[in-house]
Amino acid sequence: LLIGAIVVIAGLVFFMGGGDKSAKKSGSDSAEPIVIATHNWSSQVVMAHVIGGILESMGNNVKYVPADSQAVYESIRIGDVTLAHEVWESAFGKSFDTAREKGGVLDWGDHEARTIEDMGYPDWAAKYCPGLPDWNALKSPDCAKAFATPDSGGKGRMLEGPQSWHGDLIPQRIEALGLGDLWTVKFAGGADALWAELKAAEAEGRGTIIFNWTPNFTDGKGFTFIDFPPYYDGCRPVDGGDGKCGAPDGYLKKAVNENFPKTHPNAAEMYKKLSFNTSQIGAMAALVDEDKMTHEDAAKKWLADNKSVWEKWTK
């Protein structure tokens, strides 16, 4: 009887004292769901589910909500969304800064990957416009003609991303550089339309210039960004400049609601450590855009194949 009592007491001490450290760790986070926003490009949605999968492995509850890629930072600020994981400096930096300056949004660090977002072309299309990637090659009428489509009015067409991403930045640039008589800018409905255009142009034997970014699945396929005049602070029209400049490279940040470290301290600690590089992010996108997996299945596969990458962040 005495031995049995000792065993029971020892078991209680083990349980209450943290013998099961993983249970203790997950137990200190709130049961309220961590709300992760999803947008309209593959790496972002796959990464949302990758992060959600990591959080669920730690015992957290996760909820995914579609959100506008500009307005999401205000949603984080007021607590409707918990975190953002792909804050692209060029596209979303101003919206992020505006929300952060109001209070309620925390900068939760950068990914290892650096970003570029600009107009460019698949390497096989260079033959249609000798002189690329120098932007001056776009001044050639023959070049523009080789990039014309039925909806471009005889001009060369550039296919931008959704207008919600950058507003009229690219049309303003084309006009500022004196290319408006030869080129027109159209807006894609989403990232899928950009990738469909790549396939269509190759099949039809014409050139194509699209908006693209890195990190992305196209990193391994051969894609070149056009060398526009260098970016400098203040060169864009929104900042009072003439718009005659390309895009800078930039950060890829994480953002969280200010209460996240208080309500979910272990999750917040993991998320602070989390950092993906260019090849990892490109691989996530490729599972959807090339392998045609669903975002959810792509995330499950990435997590299963890369435990050595992410499990250390949960320790």
Predicted feature locations:
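Short, well-ordered beta-strand elements
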Residues: 29-43, 60-65, 155-159, 271
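An extracytoplasmic/periplasmic, membrane-proximal ligand-sensing/linker region
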Residues: 32, 43, 165-184, 188-205, ...
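Short helix-initiation/N-cap motifs at beta->coil->alpha
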Residues: 39-42, 60-75, 185-197
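Short, polar/charged alpha-helical segment
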Residues: 42-61, 173-174
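Pocket-flanking alpha-helical
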Residues: 48, 67-103, 193, 217-222
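Ligand-binding pocket segment of bilobal, Venus flytrap-like solute-binding proteins
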Residues: 81-86, 157-232, 237
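A conserved helix-loop-strand patch within extracytoplasmic ligand-binding domains
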Residues: 104-159
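A bilobed periplasmic-binding-protein/Venus flytrap-type ligand-binding module shared by bacterial periplasmic
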Residues: 117-128, 249-263, 286-287
